[in-house]
């Protein structure tokens, strides 16, 4: 038998807390305790009934929570049918509720004992009808009202009872609870409710890691190892429930420092960490933006960054969401305290304020500070200790596999729209772009695109574009090779122009001494490359002035085929103070440590040390800096070859500098007529007859001249008339002391 009743509000708050449908005493017989209420065809909701005289006949009262769940409006006509539960199959053995405060604005950190809550719930609602998804209001010990949502219902499977098997449980859509029903409370997602006790179920938490992220979509390549390391150190603890973390006594990592050469992807990586995480949009702050001209405003700017996190931590406690704050160029505001001149001390107080916010007396556990810098050495040490920016990750230059990934990312759209030729092999380009950073690889792709576009532009009186450019435009292999040769050079690459300048005349093999020097030099190169080597090989190329030491060192550096070759020359430091010179030398070595294979050519060491024989005088500060750097081992896995040249070996020995070198290569002068003749044959200035005549004149004479001096005399002879060249050459050699025309005794 169906009744047609109109919906109305629940007459009193006390009746609302019963979570039952309120009907008039005269509308239903005493034995009917449950009703199937249907607000629309196909919709059925099972309610327990509460009979009272406070509801008019022909009406059924619902609380606001019940009306929302059953989608019932005031004065809506409802079809109400009496309902009877099956005593054997509809008895709920276990119910699980998703629990939160009914009114989210009035939250409390007061603990709620889930065991006591379960007992109280059974006392209040024994015999109650429940449906999965049903919303209820629960008043526990006059504390703040709780909102419950039925998450799951379990009942005994009657088949297992009939077959004599072990009792089996099955999930049901609705049922009624009895005095022995097990009640569990699970905290709702992002709820600040503090549940305690054994009747506490699983906590509903949103995974901190976004499920659909990947490096390719984020535009990041070659940083898989770094991301894995950051995840292990910084995010693994945040994946687990706060209760487990609390039981372990574990503290989350609050800070990450990303450092490394410019253009390697530090800022991109930090920006995309927010995409990787299910957290609030990160606050990205440029370091200098923090500083303010007004007293105290710089510190206030730091406090404002943490204000939201502090407020949420107080309100939600361990259930607070993660707040990410990213500092770009953090070295601008976190320099070593006491290192900045001036009496304002603004930088020092900003550092102090940041230290206290990250890990001070009132600790915040819901923040992650990410700092980025090229100059890790400038940052205050207190900021780098555990509890602050404790995860320090070097974002180094990508290896060949990483360069392939980066090139794939930057050429992806061209491949999608068929704007790149099949002859472009990213693996080949990656092999050619040693020590290129991510930004430089992106620049290389742009330069190749510009080269391809330029082919379709006609620059006559007017600049016109080929009308069929859309179809013709394709980037090919030659575009990449052209850009690699002319447009983009790596900051941590080979100083090719300087080496070519040093080798303007090449290395002339005038005899066995030169061959032996090149062979020995290549042995040191192989020693530096060898996996089992210590990682540091330093060689002094010593010899008389003008003997070709610089050219030999440059030739060895070029033959090494190291991706990073830098020249440290006194020419680049003219006018530098001692401290500026030391900083310049140190920067060259620091840059070398960032490459897997590096070679540094330190030319003319005694000039670098400001050595003067009258006095004598030298720069002790520069000497000590060089001694330290020559002996310093590069980081693990990095290899460094140092080639130094000097014309004053005895001076370096007095300065106790020779012991800093692995070995010494002695470059001799030309000491035999055959040596000079070999050079003359190589220069193609003198005819064979002239060379033979010069050989006869020099036979039995003492020869001692440097290759550089000899080449200078040959250039001078080039300007002389053909008939006088040989005579002029020999006379100048004698004048310069390179040839003693007196016969040997």
UniProtKB/Swiss-Prot annotation:
Keywords: ATP-binding, Cytoplasm, ER-Golgi transport, Hydrolase, Magnesium, Metal-binding, Nucleotide-binding, Protein transport, Repeat, Transport. The keyword Magnesium applies. InterPro entries: AAA+_ATPase, AAA_lid_3, Asp_de-COase-like_dom_sf, ATPase_AAA_core, ATPase_AAA_CS, Cdc48_dom2, CDC48_domain_2-like_sf, CDC4_N-term_subdom. Pfam families: AAA, AAA_lid_3, CDC48_N, NSF_ATPase_lid. Nervous system. This is Vesicle-fusing ATPase 1. ATP binds at residues 505-510, 545-552. Mg(2+) binds at residue 550. Belongs to the AAA ATPase family.
């Amino acid at each position: 038998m169906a009744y047609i009743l109109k919906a109305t509000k629940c007459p009193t708050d006390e009746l609302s807390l019963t979570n039952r449908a309120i009907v008039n005493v005269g509308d239903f017989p005493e034995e009917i305790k449950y009703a199937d209420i249907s607000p629309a065809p196909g919709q059925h909701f099972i309610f327990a009934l509460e009979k009272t005289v406070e509801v008019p006949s022909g009406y059924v009262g619902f609380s606001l929570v019940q009306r929302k769940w059953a989608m019932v409006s005031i004065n809506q006509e409802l079809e109400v049918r009496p309902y009877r539960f099956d005593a054997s199959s509809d008895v709920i053995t276990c119910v699980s509720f998703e629990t939160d405060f009914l009114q989210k604005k009035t939250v409390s950190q007061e603990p709620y004992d889930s065991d006591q809550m379960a007992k109280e719930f059974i006392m209040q609602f024994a015999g109650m009808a429940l449906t999965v998804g049903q919303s209820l209001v629960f008043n526990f010990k006059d504390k703040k009202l709780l909102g419950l949502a039925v998450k799951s219902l379990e009942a005994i499977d009657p088949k297992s009872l009939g077959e004599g098997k072990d009792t089996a449980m099955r999930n049901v859509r609705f049922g009624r609870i009895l005095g022995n029903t097990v009640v569990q409370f699970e905290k709702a997602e992002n709820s600040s409710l503090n549940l305690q006790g054994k009747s506490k179920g699983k906590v509903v938490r949103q995974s901190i890691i976004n499920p659909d992220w990947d490096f390719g979509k984020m535009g990041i390549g070659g940083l898989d190892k770094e991301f894995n390391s950051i995840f292990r150190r910084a995010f693994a603890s945040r994946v687990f429930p706060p209760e487990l973390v609390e039981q372990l006594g574990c503290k989350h990592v609050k800070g990450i420092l990303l450092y490394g050469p410019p253009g390697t992807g530090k800022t991109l990586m930090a920006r995309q960490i927010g995409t990787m995480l299910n957290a609030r949009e990160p606050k990205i702050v440029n370091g200098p933006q923090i500083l303010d001209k007004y007293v105290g405003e710089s510190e206030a700017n730091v406090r404002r960054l943490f204000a939201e996190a502090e407020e949420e931590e107080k309100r939600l406690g361990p259930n607070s969401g993660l707040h990410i704050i990213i500092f770009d160029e953090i070295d601008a505001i976190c320099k070593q305290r006491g290192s900045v001149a001036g009496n304002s001390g603004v930088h020092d107080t900003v550092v102090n304020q940041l230290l206290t916010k990250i890990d001070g007396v009132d600790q915040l556990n819901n923040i992650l500070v990410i700092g980025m810098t090229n100059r890790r050495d400038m940052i205050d040490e207190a900021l780098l200790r555990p509890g602050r920016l404790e995860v320090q990750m070097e974002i180094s230059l990508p290896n060949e596999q990483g360069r392939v990934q980066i090139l794939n990312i930057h050429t992806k759209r061209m491949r999608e729209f068929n704007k790149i030729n099949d002859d472009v092999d990213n693996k080949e380009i990656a092999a050619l772009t040693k020590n290129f950073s991510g930004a430089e690889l992106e620049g290389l792709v742009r330069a190749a695109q510009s080269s391809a576009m330029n082919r379709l532009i006609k620059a006559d009186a007017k600049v016109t574009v080929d009308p069929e450019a859309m179809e013709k435009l394709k980037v090919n292999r030659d575009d990449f090779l052209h850009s690699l040769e002319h447009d983009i050079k790596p900051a941590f690459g080979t100083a090719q122009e300087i080496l070519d300048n040093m080798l303007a005349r090449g290395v002339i093999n005038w005899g066995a001494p030169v061959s032996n020097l090149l062979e020995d030099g290549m042995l040191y190169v192989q020693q530096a490359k060898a996996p089992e080597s210590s990682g540091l090989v330093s060689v002094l190329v010593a010899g008389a002035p003008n003997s070709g030491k610089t050219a030999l060192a440059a030739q060895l550096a070029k033959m090494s085929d190291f991706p990073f070759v830098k020249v440290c020359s006194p020419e680049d430091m003219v006018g530098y103070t001692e401290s500026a010179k030391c900083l310049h030398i140190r920067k060259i070595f620091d840059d070398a440590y960032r490459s897997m294979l590096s070679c540094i050519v330190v030319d003319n060491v005694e000039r670098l040390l400001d050595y003067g024989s009258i006095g004598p005088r030298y720069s002790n500060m520069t000497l000590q800096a060089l001694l330290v750097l020559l002996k310093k081992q590069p980081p693990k896995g990095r290899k460094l070859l140092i080639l130094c040249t000097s014309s004053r070996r005895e001076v370096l020995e007095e300065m106790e500098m020779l012991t800093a070198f692995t070995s010494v290569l002695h470059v001799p002068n030309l000491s035999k007529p055959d040596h000079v003749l070999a050079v003359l044959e190589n220069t193609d200035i003198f005819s064979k007859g002239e060379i033979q005549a010069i050989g006869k004149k020099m036979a039995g004479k003492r020869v001692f001249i440097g290759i550089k001096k000899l080449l200078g005399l040959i250039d001078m002879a080039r300007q002389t008339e053909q008939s006088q060249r040989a005579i002029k050459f020999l006379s100048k050699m004698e004048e310069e002391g390179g040839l003693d025309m007196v016969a040997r005794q």
